[in-house]
Each structure stands twice: as C-alpha cells, then as structure tokens.
Amino acid sequence: MTCGSGFCGRAFSCASACGPRPGRCCISAAPYRGISCYRGLSGGFGSQSVCGAFRSGSCGRSFGYRSGGICGPSPPCITTVSVNESLLTPLNLEIDPNAQCVKHEEKEQIKCLNSKFAAFIDKVRFLEQQNKLLETKWQFYQNRKCCESNMEPLFEGYIEALRREAECVEADSGRLAAELNHAQESMEGYKKRYEEEVSLRATAENEFVALKKDVDCAYLRKSDLEANAEALTQETDFLRRMYDEETRILHSHISDTSIVVKMDNSRDLNMDCVVAEIKAQYDDIASRSRAEAESWYRTKCEEIKATVIRHGETLRRTREEINELNRMIQRLTAEIENAKCQNTKLEAAVTQSEQQGEAALADARCKLAELEGALQKAKQDMACLLKEYQEVMNSKLGLDVEITTYRRLLEGEEQRLCEGVGAVNVCVSSSRGGVVCGDLCVSGSRPVIGSACSAPCSGNLAVNTGLCAPCGSAVSCGRKC
C-alpha cells in the first residue's frame, strides 16, 4: 500500500507498517534515494525496517525478488513474525520545503552528468576514429616499400643555392659600401659648406659691427652738425640783432647830435649818400652771410640725410643677409643631422649585412665541409666496395676456372672409362708448385716420385681420382700436387 505523489512528488512506503500475510511477499515502494520518506526525520523508516526478521528473503531497492525468501515461493510452514508496536503508531508526515529545490538540483545534476557522458562518448568515438586512422597510416607506412634516393644532387643544388646567396650578399655588400662612400663624400661636402657658411657668417657679423660703428659715428656727426647749425643760427640772430641795434644807435646819434662843420664851399659832401651806401654794403654783406650759412646748413643736412638713408639701407640689407644666413645654417644643420642619421643607419645596415653574410658564409662553409666529408666517406666506401667486388670477381674467376677444369677432367675420365683405361689418380695443381706424381705430366716431363711437377698448375688440392689436373699424373689423396 503506497501513498500518492502529493507530498512533493515523492512516493513513500506504508507497507512497512503492516505485517506480512500468508501467501504474499513484501514489496518495498521506497524511493531510490534512500529508505526515509521524510528527510527531516533522523533515521526515518522504510520497507526493510518491518521485514527485518525476513532479511534473507526481503526485496531490494530495485523491486527485485530473491528466491528462498518472503518474495519467493511460500514455504510449507510460516513462522511467527514479531512486530515492533512502536512502528504502528501514526507517523508525523510533513512536506519538506526544500524537497522541490533538492529535486530540481538533482535533475540539473543528472542533466549535467548526461551532457558530460554524451561528450565523453563523442570524445571516445573521435579518439577511436583517430586510432583507426593512425593504424591505417601505420599499416600503409609499413607496407610501403622504401626506395633509395640519391641525395647528392640535392646537396649539390643546396650548395649552389648557398653559393649564389653568398654572391648576392657580396654584391649587396659592395653596393652598400659604394653607397656608404657616396654618403661620406656628401657629408664631407656638407661639412665644408657648413664651415664656409660659418666663416661667411663671422665675416658678415664683423661687417655688421663695422657698419654699426660707422652708423654710430654718422649719428654722432649728425648730432654735432645739428648742434653747430643751431649755434650758427643763434649767432646769426645775435649778429642781426646787434647790427640792428648798432644801426639804430647810430641813427639816434646822428639824429640827436648837432655837428658844426666847417665846410669848404668849394666842395659838396652828401652824407646821406655815404650812409646809404655803407648801409647797403652792410645789408649786402649780411644777406650774403645769411645765404651762405643757410646754404651750407641745407647742404650739410642733405648730406647727413643721404648718409643716414644709405646706412639704413645697408643695415637693412645686412640684416636680411644675416637672416638668410641663419636660415641657411639651420637648413644645413638639419641636412647634416639627416645625413648623420642616414650614415648611422647605413653603417648599421652594412654591419648587419656583413654579420649575416659572414654567418651565411660560415654556415655554407660548415655545410660544404660536411658534404665534402660525406662525399669523401662515400668515395672511400665505394673504393672499399670496389675492392671487395674485385676480390669477389677474382674468386669467381678462380672458381669458374676450377669448375671448367673439373668438368674437363670429368669428361676425360668418362672417356677413359669408356675406352677401358685403368683408374688414375687426379690432383689439382697449385700455382706455387707442381704435382707429385710418378707419370708424365702434360708438359711432357717426368718428375721424380715424391717431388713437385715442374709444370705450372692451378693451385688446388689433390682429389680422390689420383690424377693431376693439368698433367694427368697420379698422386696420393689429400696431398698437394
């Protein structure tokens, strides 16, 4: 008997509160998480608490049946079951407020674990595919036949490329050296021009100082001339006033003085004419003096003005030249700084190019030395192989000669056997001695028994036939002919 799912969606078992009935098995309907229906109660209760006396036959957490227990076939007799009365009391079943949250968290954890499990499965499949791919590649590489490649053309091409690169580096080094020389020459020219402009500036400054002194002298002279002109004007005014005063006094004396003159009636003296003539002379002298003073003053003023204008124009031209020289000096200074920067950059580039060229040349030399060593070793190996090949060919030639000799001997022996000739001993002669025989050799000489044949032989040991290979003489078995 189970309760519904109204308590937070969890099912709990009440079958533990009732005892087992005959002919029935106890089936637990507890949730999969545990045996407690309410997580807040300590200890809780479940389906196994009541059926503790029938533990051997109780059902598990997965609603399974075990043979030989309560859930299996009923035995012929049922034993008495003792039940704890305290378990029959009503239970205080309450809804856990955190049960929904816990259930939601468990669902989220299950989803996360399912996602991870799916990711692991995908990863395992991917790794299996990669493993199969690698196994296929491994089998392909194992089944592929190894072919010998001649590396000498590759090394020669690489050496040629390194040589061309070294030549390009040398050409670039020469070009950069020429550019550096040109830049140095340009810098020397700019330096000379700068020194010339500095000397011209010093000369212009000296001329400016001299002209300034001349202008100061002219200004002082002008001031002196103005002071002199003013003094002369004052003196002229004073003389004019003095002349007027003297004339007035003279007229007053003449008009107030009565002079008794004894006159000679024989002559007539007109004093008015004499006075008028003297007055006219004085007036003429005064006017000429005034005109001369004014003309001299005007001339001097014009000269001073012309001198001032000329010196002002010269000063203006000198200032313009000084400003132009300053601008030229600034421009030349900037050009010199730019030339210095370019020279520094070119020197750094040349140094870097030299270092790179030296490194490339050193690397090329090392690789060339390695290639030469490898080539020399290959030549030595080839010479050894040729020597071994020559030795093998010599051995083969000797074996061919021996095989031919044996074939001829066998053919001759067959012919003798066919003709009925007795058995003869065959020996293989040595190149260093003759044959030991008692019969005639092929050469026609009869050697002494136990001595060497004088005829040249092939150098082999005697065989069981008892005949010498070149001469057909009989020798003992196992001895040298």
Curated annotation (Swiss-Prot):
PANTHER family: GATA-TYPE DOMAIN-CONTAINING PROTEIN, KERATIN, TYPE II CUTICULAR HB3
Protein name from the UniProt record: Keratin, type II cuticular Hb1
Alphabetized InterPro entries for the sequence: IF_conserved, IF_rod_dom, Keratin_2_head, Keratin_II
Gene name in the database record: Krt81
Annotated stretches, region: Linker 12: 253-269
UniProt keyword list: Coiled coil, Intermediate filament, Isopeptide bond, Keratin, Ubl conjugation
Domain of life: Eukaryota
General remark: There are two types of hair/microfibrillar keratin, I (acidic) and II (neutral to basic).
SUPFAM superfamilies with a match to the protein in the record: Intermediate filament protein, coiled coil region (SSF64593)
Keyword Hydrolase appears in the UniProt entry: no
Annotated region (Tail), positions in chain: 414-481
Gene Ontology terms: cellular component: keratin filament
